[in-house]
Amino acid sequence: MAKSKMLDLRNLSVDELIKTNESKRAELFALKFQAAVGSLEQTHRIKEIKKEIARIELALSEKRLSGENTNKVIKADYNKAVEEAEKAGKEVRAKQRKFLEEQYGQQSQTKVNEADIQKAMQAAEQETVEPDTKGETK
């Protein structure tokens, strides 16, 4: 799978590689932002994006060694990446809030009978615990 990705990357032009690299870096920034806020569900994506960036950097260095000019500056749109991260984060937080509310609702619906608690307490008091006499010296 990685070999096919590298073949695809090697076929791209330098400009396309740089654009892809910057967009992946922006995506990584957004994912790290989500992780810091606590709204990242797919934590494995950070590792995948880092590997993809490394593959792109390798392809760029191969092109640089072959004599192509790779010193071009193309800026990524970090604002767009952050907006997408915030949108995804809001969805995740809403999902988490809904789950917690459901759990709380289920727990609060379970009613405990006070008489049952008293019976259990009395039964526990009536049980006698025998002391351990095996370790004592005479």
Curated annotation (Swiss-Prot):
Gene3D superfamilies xrefs: 1.10.287.310
Family statement: Belongs to the universal ribosomal protein uL29 family.
Membrane spanning stretches: none
Protein source organism: Mycoplasma capricolum subsp. capricolum (strain California kid / ATCC 27343 / NCTC 10154)
Region (Disordered): 103-138
UniProt-annotated stretches for the region Large ribosomal subunit protein uL29: 1-79
The protein's name: Large ribosomal subunit protein uL29
Xref: PROSITE patterns: RIBOSOMAL_L29 (PS00579)
GO BP, sorted A to Z: translation
InterPro entries, per database record: Ribosomal_uL29 (IPR001854), Ribosomal_uL29_CS (IPR018254), Ribosomal_uL29_sf (IPR036049)
Top-level taxonomic group: Bacteria
